[in-house]
């Protein structure tokens, strides 16, 4: 069955979906007694999933995904992200609104002339928010930012409440059902080490996967995800299509602003001669957490020695100037206070 065979494009060796080598064209024209197909199957790769992301790992010594995520899966369990989908939205011809009949894509890629770590660090901090992202700052206001990180290989922040303010177009998108008060009123912004950037809103998610190409080049693979409901119907309502298009353009505008500032920073770093500046504790502590993860993985002799970082302690001990969240996620609301 050719349809169930994985073919190498070079010499056309064929593999079954279980990884076994099933054909090696012309290889036996000169027989070899030391050749056993059973020895030459595809290399097994660890694959696990969480939410909308598939994770592949080439190092068997790396901790399992559940340990890597720490409490992140529990933190975001209320969203039911495993059911959210990236789709192409097309307005119904029966909406009576021809202007909404265009198709919008929910995936896109960007070529960034900057190191992947710089892109991730930029996402992890909000010190630049008011100056680089004037429109985003109307929805995700600096004064409403709080830390959002427990044990796990991630760093994060939340905007609570996330506000329509002067940009309420996205509110037309139907929210996920069953959200608690904290999830329903917040925006979560998580850097899952090393290369997954998540912007999680009550009614949509913007996912960015960073592909490190060279020391000065990164490809961003982006997708918009939607919860089950009108946005994922085969023919969604015209109002939803319009809201998605406005939301898509908004996030691409924000991402373009990030790309510009990261590329400018990359040019400065590449020239050398300027020492790095201090981190602003309130706004950039997640960057310090990210730096420690990079340093750990650069200096460990083996992944078996990796220690997944703990989270912020409850109370104010680790807040570095950030106030307590008025509507904390359930994993923080249920934690005991400490000083």
Protein language model features and the residues they cover:
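Rieske [2Fe-2S] iron-sulfur-binding domain
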Residues: 1-60, 66-74
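C-terminal catalytic domain of Rieske-type non-heme iron oxygenases
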Residues: 46-48, 53-339
